[in-house]
Amino acid sequence: MSVSAVELASLAAGPDAVRRLGARRGFLGETPANRELARILRDRPETFGSVHSLVLGADEVHVPDLAASRGFAPSLQVFGLECIDGFQRLRILSDALAGLGAEHLEKATVRLEIHCGRYRDVARSLHDAGHRLVNATTAQDGLIRCPNVRWLMAGDWEKEGFFDPRRGVSAGPHRRCFSMPEVTRGLACLSLAPGPEALHLATTDEGIERLWGAVGSELYLGVFRDRMSPLGVVRAVEAYDSARAALRNLPGRLKKGAGHLIDYAPDLICWKACRRLLPLEDLHVEAGSRHDWGGMIEDQLPAVTARTAEDLVRRYEAVHRARGDGPHYKGEAELLDVWREVLG
């Protein structure tokens, strides 16, 4: 059932509310989720109850005589109330009643479930284990709402393969499936942004999630620009793969000392090499491109990458010596500040 938020706001009032309602935990305060719920209630109260239900248990529920009330039950009498799930929302409603007033809360409704008898035990058991029954949302799940990504999805992929940013989507009978991580790293490597910050984030799973979660930010839009094309994505992925392969093929003697940069910060070298050779501003130009992208990526980029590696290793040697961090290269070479110093 849907209930006016103002009718529920007083349930969590008072310092003893969590004990009185038998909730699993007290009010958690300024958590990100609670701040967002409070913001929605303040700015868009009509949408507050759109997600999730408030789940209560009760010893008894008395329903008024429907005949006397012409088919409508204006109120319920609930005895032995328990908050099975939703105490944070109840407390947010209680605080909003004091801060925003009853008139504001009347704009919000809450979906309410009340369970009695054995159904109460079942509901309690399910909600106690609720975290094990829900697949956690990740930043990647929000990419489907990005207009630039949706534009890219709507492009003509028939010749190029298959692309979908969502987790758990199979490629089907397509020639090539481009995963969201490889698309992100390719586009970050060939981004028009002046620095390698986006690609540095994309080098780790945690970093790439942070990048995906920053939809609309300058860093994000430097990677996922407007009007991207399937062919541009293919070029970016192939260029990134070509540069990485060129580094793997370098002889081991070049990867000693400061040459550890090749193993510990390969994306820095790829980023710089692509800038030295490729016309990044034309990445997503499909018809009538002035450039032989295939030839540049296959025939020229490996050699440019090798020369770039030699240049950046020499620069890193000076940076490493100036930092005085001893013989350990791995942790140092992975730092964004070191990348910036090496690039000068």
Which positions does each model-derived feature cover?
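Short, well-ordered loop/turn elements at secondary-structure boundaries
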Residues: F48-V51, L76-F79, E106-T109
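Short helix/loop capping segments that flank catalytic or ligand/cofactor-binding pockets
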Residues: P64-L66, R91-L93, V122-A123
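N-terminal extension/subdomain marker
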Residues: M1-F48, A73, L81, L268, ...
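Hydrophobic alpha-helical segments
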Residues: T47-V55, V63
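Short His-Asn-centered micro-motif
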Residues: L56-G57, C83-F87, H115-C116
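Short active-site loop/helix that positions an aromatic residue
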Residues: V78-L81, F87-H104
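C-terminal catalytic or substrate-handling cores of phosphate/nucleotide-
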Residues: A38, R42, E106-A108, L112-L280
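A short acidic-Thr-Gly-centered motif at the start of a beta-strand
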Residues: A67-Q77, C274
